UniProtKB/Swiss-Prot annotation:
Family membership noted in the UniProt record: Belongs to the cuticular collagen family.
InterPro entries reported for this sequence: Col_cuticle_N, Collagen
Keyword hit for Transmembrane helix: no
Protein name listed in UniProt: Putative cuticle collagen 80
Region spans: Triple-helical region: 92-124, 137-199, 202-264
Keyword Cell wall biogenesis/degradation: no
Record gene name: col-80
Keywords of this entry: Collagen, Cuticle, Disulfide bond, Repeat
Ranges of biased composition (kind: Low complexity): 108-124, 135-145, 175-206, 242-262
Function: Nematode cuticles are composed largely of collagen-like proteins. The cuticle functions both as an exoskeleton and as a barrier to protect the worm from its environment.
Top-level taxonomy: Eukaryota, Metazoa, Ecdysozoa, Nematoda, Chromadorea
């Protein structure tokens, strides 16, 4: 069961992973297509923007001419012929420079130039001039220490020593390596015969450990008929048994006798009692007895249940 469950879960996991890979591939393809489309739209937008700019620049001169004509006409129409106008007035000071215009487009490339004439070797002019002698400058800072030079040659041998004498013996050297084993020696002469031995008898040793238990023996023969043995002593009392089921309710008791009539009141005589009064009294007494009996039965049931629960706990313990 566990192997089948694991196989099913492994198959479902593989399907989910395969679906995730396919989704990633689709998302990657969609992103690439979106990027390509965005680049194409940007290129088209740049082309439209360049065309619009070129058309605006080409029509700039005509727009300026039309604008100047319109402004002059507007100025002429805005003149007022209210009085004589001044004439031959001196020119006013030049106005402030206007705002710089937009940068114009690059011009068309000019035609290729004509090839130049071939070069001619000219005469060489050599003028010998003396070197300019400058005064000596201040000494520069000390340089870094140089690399060590090569080792010098060996010196001449010294003069021989005189009167040294032989020195004390040196300490013992380390032990040498073990030598190879020597050849076997010649066999020796036979030894003398030994003395005669004495026979002795030792004491018995201690007893050994008991051996393992042997196999069970064969069943014995049936015994001869004999009288039963005497009765053993009585055993200890056993535990209390479980409480029995509650018994059935008993039969309702017989109705009681009628009570004696009460004494009359002191202030007025009571009328004689009728049979309806006695019947009502009997019904009330019977009801009271039934209610009391039900209460007793309910108490007995509660006590019996408690005993059953206590017995179960005792058995479990």
């Amino acid at each position: 069961m566990s192997t089948t469950f694991l196989s099913v879960m492994a198959g479902l996991s593989g399907i989910v992973v395969f679906g995730a890979l396919i989704s990633v591939f689709h998302i990657y393809t969609d992103i690439n297509s979106f990027v390509d489309e965005a680049h194409r739209e940007l290129g088209a937008f740049r082309g439209v923007a360049n065309d619009a700019w070129n058309s605006m620049v080409n029509h700039d001169d005509s727009a300026r001419v039309a604008r100047s004509v319109f402004v002059r006409r507007q100025k002429k129409q805005s003149q007022c012929n209210c009085g004589p106008q001044a004439s031959n007035c001196p020119a006013g000071p030049p106005g402030p420079p206007g705002a710089s215009g937009d940068r114009g487009l690059d011009g068309q490339p000019g035609p290729a130039g004509k090839p130049g004439q071939p070069g001619v070797a000219g005469p060489a002019h050599h003028q010998q001039q003396e070197c300019i002698k400058c005064p000596q400058g201040a000494p520069g800072p000390a340089g870094a220490p140089g690399n060590p030079g090569p080792q010098g040659p060996n010196g001449n041998p010294g003069a021989p020593a005189h009167g040294g004498g032989q020195g004390p013996p040196g300490p013992p050297g380390p032990a040498g390596d073990a030598g190879s084993p020597g050849q076997a020696g010649a066999p020796g002469n036979p030894g003398r015969p030994g003395q005669s031995g004495q026979r002795s008898r030792g004491l018995p040793g201690p007893s050994g450990r008991p051996g393992p238990q042997g196999p069970p023996g064969a069943p014995g023969q049936p015994g001869s008929g004999s009288t039963p043995g005497p009765a053993g002593p009585p055993g200890p009392p056993g535990p209390n048994g479980q409480p029995g089921h509650p018994g059935q309710d008993g039969q309702p008791g017989a109705p009681g006798n009628d009570g004696a009539p009460g004494s009359d009141a002191a202030y007025c005589p009571c009328p004689a009692r009728s049979a309806a009064v006695f019947r009502h009294r009997n019904v009330a007494v019977n009801r009271h007895r039934a209610v009391a009996k039900k209460r007793v039965v309910a108490k007995k049931r509660v006590v019996a249940r408690k005993r059953v629960v206590a017995a179960r706990r005792h058995v479990q313990a």
